[in-house]
Each structure stands twice: as C-alpha cells, then as structure tokens.
Swiss-Prot record:
HAMAP family: tRNA_thiouridyl_MnmA. Belongs to the MnmA/TRMU family. GO terms for cellular component: cytoplasm. The gene is mnmA. The record marks H128, Q344 as: Interaction with tRNA. PANTHER family: MITOCHONDRIAL TRNA-SPECIFIC 2-THIOURIDYLASE 1, TRNA 5-METHYLAMINOMETHYL-2-THIOURIDYLATE -METHYLTRANSFERASE. The keyword 4Fe-4S does not apply. The active site is at C103 (nucleophile), C200 (cysteine persulfide intermediate). This is tRNA-specific 2-thiouridylase MnmA. The keyword Kinase does not apply.
Length: 373
C-alpha cells in the first residue's frame, strides 16, 4: 500500500460541511493535510457580523477536531481584480455573468493553488462535487459527481489539465446526505451548518440592492417586440433572458392570462422586451456562439464534435454539434433551447466526462441573431 503520509494535500476550507468532510476524509486516508481558509471578500451581514470571521472560527474548530494545521490567506485583491471587475463589466455589457466559473478558474484553482504550492503541496483539494480520473499516462479526466443534484462540473469547466493534475475531489463519489452523515458521525462543528446559497460575495443579501451599490441603475422603457409600451424597467442589469418575476405587469395586458417573461434587451436603446408565454417564440433558439472556449485537455485548433451540453446549472444535458476554431465555437442544438443567456456558460460533456466549455455570446434562431443584448 502506498504511504500517503508523504503526500501533502492543502484543502480549501470555507467553514462549510463539504470542505470540512473533505479535510476529514483525507486525514483518515493518511495524507499530510493542511487547511486553508480563503478570505476573498470584505463583508458583514445585516447584523454587522463579519461572516468571514464566523466561517474562520468554524474552520479552526474543525481543523482542531481532526488534528490538522490551518491558516487564513487573503485573496481580496485578486478576487476584486480577476472576478468582481469581470462580474461588473458583464452586467454593464447587458450580459448575465456566472462569477462561480471565474472564481474557480482564477481564485480557487489559480491564486489558491499557487499559494498551496509554496506550502509544498502535492495536491489541492476542495469540497466540490466532481470526480477526477487519472490515466496511466498521467492524463486527468474530470467526471460528474455521483450526486446528480449536486454535480458541480458546470462551474469547474474552465479548469486546465495543469490545474486538474494537481486537484483532488474527495467528495465526488458521495451524495450530499452521506457527507452530512459523515460529519455528524465525526461530531464535526459544521455538521448541521446550512449550505451557503447565492453568489460567493453577495451571500444572502438582496441582489438588486447589492448591484446598485456598484452600478448606477438606468431605468428605461419596457415594451413588447411589436412596439407596445408596457411601462418602465428598473435597469437592464436586473433582468435576465427568460425571467418571469419582478416585471410588475401581471396579467393585465393582452387578451390571454399567460404570464409575462423577459424575451429580449436592447442595451443601446435601454429597452427591455417582454412577451407572454414560457415558450415565447423569441425565447427559443437553435444555435449559439461562444467565446473563451477551453478544454480540459489538449485539442486540435479546429474541429467539430457531437456531444451533449448544459447551458445552465442543474439543467438536463442536450445533444449538440460543436464547431471549434481556436477559443471560439458555434454550437448547434438538436432541439430548440429556451432562454440561452449571453454571459452564462455552455459546458460540454461526453457521457459523464466534462470536456470543457465557454461563455455564451449570442443566441440564434435559424441563423438570425436574437436581440438579447
């Protein structure tokens, strides 16, 4: 049996149950484990309590329980420069960004990995629900987590082969209830802590309120694609393609009582387009353009492949044909897709293997671009 005690694994510990169990399992498997708490955002909750301080206390309690050293490292500047500025720029451009994808790419598997290597790490580990499979020739494949409901490969799709080579996902073969049960059996301080929701730096706060602190809202006209005035919107950045709530128009307009949805945006004119019906014609597209396309292993500069794709988290896979040129791709859908949203990720799969992905730029219907920006 190999001696794991000579293999140093640095675990990103958030103060949550998933990363706590990650550290516990690695320690039980005999690895030389170090816990690191990343402080990425300077924040207090509505009661004036610094949430990072509370989370760090939980990390300290768990690390003491399982007997591993732990440290805190501050990545606030890197986070602001590499994730938050991107997040704001995307909203300014009328898009709907996915900061978790960028946070994994730039912070958890870049800034954190670089820091871990200075501590002599052989690997880093996180509490993500994903799996890595290592070939004999050293190539690493990223597979979906066993818990379909928790699988996080969508958010990890921008990781490189070099990053995956250095990564372990000890929870990948477990389902969430099993992870909680392990934490409770071990009496970990975080066993009953509820999962965090929302964007990492916003936490539980009101999204609209938070965004308006950084981007001035520009109210404008809300109308149908036929040109009928439907009142005023609060600012394009507050709406995403396919959204239903928050429009304030109910069923009072139009002959039928079908609900209203965001069906388009015109950033240059500051117009929000709305229409009735979940499957409104303007919400259905047949292809998309993506940029920043990246694969987890080396691929040819230009190629075409058939695979499946996700266009948002927790969505069932859809069959697609992908034509790649450099870091751009055209993705044609076997069946029309609803609410393909610029700024979100498109992620490619071959069975359970996550191949990589890109960021959605434009959606098309039978070759015609849909006005989503």
């Amino acid at each position: 049996m190999s001696d794991n005690s000579k293999i140093r694994v640095v675990v990103g510990m958030s103060g949550g149950v998933d990363s706590s169990v990650t550290a516990l399992l690695l320690k039980e498997q005999g690895y030389d484990v170090i816990g690191i708490f990343m402080k990425n955002w300077d924040d207090t909750d509505e009661f004036g309590v610094c949430t990072a301080t509370e989370d760090y206390k939980d990390v300290a309690a768990v690390a003491d329980q399982i007997g591993i050293p732990y440290y805190s490292v501050n990545f606030e500047k890197e986070y602001w420069d590499r994730v938050f500025e991107y997040f704001l720029a995307e909203y300014r451009a009328g898009r709907t960004p996915n900061p978790d994808v960028m946070c994994n790419k730039e912070i958890k598997f870049k800034a954190f990995l670089d820091y871990a290597l200075t501590l002599g790490a052989d690997y880093v580990a996180t509490g993500h629900y994903a799996q890595v499979k290592r070939d004999q020739d050293g190539l690493v494949h990223m597979l979906r987590g066993k818990d379909n409901n928790k699988d996080q490969t969508y958010f990890l799709s921008q990781l490189s082969q070099e990053q995956l080579q250095k990564t372990m996902f000890p929870l990948g073969h477990l389902e969430k209830p099993e992870v909680r049960a392990i934490a409770e059996r071990a009496g970990l301080a975080t066993a009953k802590k509820k999962d965090s929701t929302g964007i990492c730096f916003i936490g539980e706060k009101n999204f609209k309120e938070f965004l308006s602190q950084y981007l001035p809202a520009q109210p404008g006209r809300m109308m149908t694609l036929e040109g009928r005035d439907m009142g005023q919107h609060a600012g394009l950045m507050y709406y995403t393609i396919g959204q239903r709530g928050g429009l304030g128009i109910g069923g009072q307009h139009g002959g039928d009582n079908e609900p209203w949805f965001v069906v388009g945006k015109d950033l240059s004119q500051n117009i929000l387009y709305v229409g009735q019906g979940f499957y409104h014609d303007n919400l259905m597209s047949t292809s998309l353009d993506a940029s920043q396309v990246h694969f987890t292993k080396e691929m040819p500069e230009e190629f075409t492949m058939e695979c499946t794709a996700k266009f948002r988290y927790r969505q069932p896979d859809s069959k697609v044909t992908v034509t790649v040129k450099g870091d751009k791709a055209v993705v044609n859908f076997d069946k029309p897709q609803r609410a393909i949203t610029p700024g979100q990720g498109v992620v490619f799969y071959d069975g359970d293997e996550c191949l990589g992905g890109g960021l959605i730029d434009r959606a098309y219907k039978n070759g015609q671009v849909l006005q989503y920006i």
